[in-house]
Amino acid sequence: MSKKIQAIRGMSDLLPKDSAFWLSLERTIFDLFISYGYQNIRTPIVEKTDTFCRAIGGATDIVEKEMYSWIESGGESLSLNPEGTAGCVRMMIEHNLPREGIQKVFYQGAMFRRERPQKGRYRQFHQVGLEVFGATNAKVDAELMMITHTLWQVLGLKNIVLEINTLGSSETRVAYRKILIAYFNQYKDQLDENSLKRLKTNPLRILDSKNKAMRSLINNAPKLMDYLDKESAQHFEQFKTYLDALNVTYIINTCLVRGLDYYNRTVFEWTTTNLGAQGTICAGGRYDGLVEKMGGIPTPAVGLAIGLERLILLLEVQNLMAIEPTLSIYLVALGEKAQIKSMQIASTLHDALPNVILYNDLTLGSFKSQLKKANKIKAYFALILGEQELNNNQVSIKPLKGQGTQQTMDLEEAIKYLKENK
């Protein structure tokens, strides 16, 4: 017997029993984004590896360890998307979109990282993201928080907290980097192996360490907030003022630095304690220098990404997985003539009831077996087309959820009945 083919570990299939909720959730998210004036974009899942090296930073864990990369026959290195912002920025530059004024866009798609699979962390995962190009003030940062806060309310989520921080300007971080190196050099014997490496490459990432043994050392480290340039300090104060006006509760986390090199000023995470170590549901920040760094005109920008798998895990934990029921009908056809007629009726019903799910039987089975399938898929009504119905140019409607008794009527009356009983 041949060995059964299986999916790659950490890359899961989405089965029909789960996809209805995914579609419903994505529709809710996209409708909300569109209502705030964001437009959808689609970028390739593969980019030149250099795109990510320049954007994310060569010393980050993503570039060093986690990307799926390969060399093309011509010698060029390509990579699967590990995140969405770099490809979005590349697209903006390539099509000269920043020259057209403020751009508000959203994207969705699969991302790929070579990680150790565990609950809430996968090798293929899905994100939806918002990006705004061309606006430098804190108002747009606050708008992103307002949108996500509204989304949590629409979904009914509880126990989700907004953590914010500021990383200041690039000049501020250069000066602070030296201060941080001097501090941690005094305690090198207390640093773990990963932090010793970061001390040489990106000392700010030490602040993000999950090593509990280093927590006291990190908490006592100099705070970037104390070394902010005037403009960044004002920007952060404006950001907080907007959040207060919107009644969006937040906590300031001075150790929040994010794992990508392109961030400056505002950074944020929406977190929950319901998912253990993988508690970040949404994260992002400002990246005012990235467009220029990647070859475009100087363009301020800010964005966020929501991890769909983690969001769905949280909805599941909080028992919020129910979706609004949609009227569904199973079309039962008995006999060869009825099969042909059922196709015509199905076409008419789709036109008259566009939001109704219609299952046209494909088994050509007995009345009993077709009705059994109708009950299995939890249809609300069976629309029956047998010999008697054919001869009288009628259909029979059988309620399957106790909504009444079976009735026979012409198709026009049936459509009216179904509209009234949605």
Curated annotation (Swiss-Prot):
Cited PROSITE patterns: AA_TRNA_LIGASE_II
GO molecular function: ATP binding; histidine-tRNA ligase activity
Main location: cytoplasm
Record localization: Cytoplasm
Record field: catalytic activity: tRNA(His) + L-histidine + ATP = L-histidyl-tRNA(His) + AMP + diphosphate + H(+)
UniProt-listed InterPro entries: aa-tRNA-synth_II, aa-tRNA-synth_II/BPL/LPL, Anticodon-bd, Anticodon-bd_dom_sf, His-tRNA-ligase, HisRS-like_core, HisRS/HisZ
Enzyme Commission no: 6.1.1.21
Keywords: Aminoacyl-tRNA synthetase, ATP-binding, Cytoplasm, Ligase, Nucleotide-binding, Protein biosynthesis
A GO-annotated cellular component: cytoplasm
Pfam short name (any one): HGTP_anticodon
GO biological process terms, semicolon-separated: histidyl-tRNA aminoacylation
Family designation: Belongs to the class-II aminoacyl-tRNA synthetase family.
HAMAP family in UniProt: His_tRNA_synth
Subunit description: Homodimer.
Protein name: Histidine--tRNA ligase
Organism whose genome encodes this protein: Ruthia magnifica subsp. Calyptogena magnifica
